[in-house]
Amino acid sequence: MSWWWAGAIGAARKKFEEDDAPRDCQSVALIIGVTGIVGNSLAEILPISDTPGGPWKVYGVARRPRPAWNADHPVEYIQCDISDASDTHTKLSPLTDVTHIFWVTWANRPTESECCELNGTMLRNVLNALIPKAANLHHICLQTGHKHYIGPFEAFGKIKPHEPPFTEDMPRLNAPNFYYTLEDMLVEASEKKAGLNWSVHRPAVIFGFSPFSMMNIIGTLCVYAAICKHENTPLKFPGTKAAWNCYSVASDADLIAEHQIWAAVDPYAKNEAFNCSNGDLFKWKHLWKVLAEQFGVEYAEFDESEKPTSLVERMKDKGPVWEEIVRENGLHTTKLEGVATWWFADVILGGECLLDSMNKSKEHGYLGFRNTKNSLISVIDKMKAHKIVP
């Protein structure tokens, strides 16, 4: 079977060993956002010996110093603030051998117009630094997401989103959206440089490992479960009845990475936008039991008689509790606000269920998939192994 199929069912990967003989690299990747939830998966998967398009040499860019949990990946780490044109040019223009860019980062601002401005500046700085220098640059993967179909957070309830299931041919909504800004910049850049192709990847809510991610739903729920366990309280669902009961889709971070690599090396996938989800359906009420089991905490059914309380409200004074959990369990030193994004979990667990279609990816030859329950367990195991949660 193909590498995509083998990866999708969790077949053992050929890990790159530091004492392997030097390899002549066919492709050179630049991961923008290497410590993010998908960037970390790309940093794990690209260096594997049989990854399509390889052998790969990998550069990874992030704003902060390299974290310990990312340090084992055979990646040349570059600390760079890509919102700063001078820093970006100084750090990235020497990378003349780059053949593929994987854009898996974003920056948040109070308004969507500001998001458009800042994220557009970041992409422009990277393209301006690389395109004149990297003669063999021929593909850019841009990761966006379901907000392409429902609008930015500030527009929720103000504009009419598309009706699920989402398909890639749905028109843009009439609202500012930095996803649209980045797509337009990508297409414009490809039109100016001969041989430069692109792909856009639109995942659902992402299940993956990255303590630094602003939108890490599973990491946040792991912290919530650990606090419930520590305080000997039931694991209550903080969202709505609709989210508890309805069918949902998720996107495993490794699957998204594989999807992007496929699009980067397969000629039939170039210059296209694709949804990217696991290919199955789940209900939060079923995953909630799994989460409770993994942390040995009492599971609580959704109770309609109780007034809903957001995680932002429940967790607002739990900083000292988290410090105690970290100290007692010998965990990696973190602040609660650094490992848990309560507002994002409230958005996901308080909203309507958003389904998409993977038909276009299948029609173009991508058959990867994930079991969402197993994806959840895998992320929890990784959080524990890296001593982020007990």
UniProtKB/Swiss-Prot annotation:
InterPro entries (alphabetical): NAD(P)-bd_dom_sf, PRISE-like_Rossmann-fold
Binding site for substrate: 147, 179
Active site: 147, 179
Enzyme class: oxidoreductase
Reactions catalysed according to its record: (S)-8-oxocitronellyl enol + NADP(+) = (6E)-8-oxogeranial + NADPH + H(+); (S)-8-oxocitronellyl enol + NAD(+) = (6E)-8-oxogeranial + NADH + H(+)
Keyword Oxidoreductase: yes
Domain of life: Eukaryota
Keyword terms, alphabetized: NADP, Oxidoreductase
An annotated Gene Ontology molecular function: oxidoreductase activity, acting on the CH-CH group of donors
Annotated positions binding NADP(+): 35-37, 63-64, 81-82, 105-106, 143, 179, 213-215
GO biological process: monoterpene biosynthetic process
EC number: 1.3.1.122
Entry similarity comment: Belongs to the short-chain dehydrogenases/reductases (SDR) family. Highly divergent.
Function: Iridoid synthase that catalyzes the first step in generation of the iridoid ring scaffold using the linear monoterpene (6E)-8-oxogeranial as substrate. Iridoids comprise a large family of distinctive bicyclic monoterpenes that possess a wide range of pharmacological activities, including anticancer, anti-inflammatory, antifungal and antibacterial activities.
Protein name per UniProt: (S)-8-oxocitronellyl enol synthase CYC2
Gene source species: Camptotheca acuminata
Lineage of the species this protein comes from: Eukaryota, Viridiplantae, Streptophyta, Embryophyta, Tracheophyta
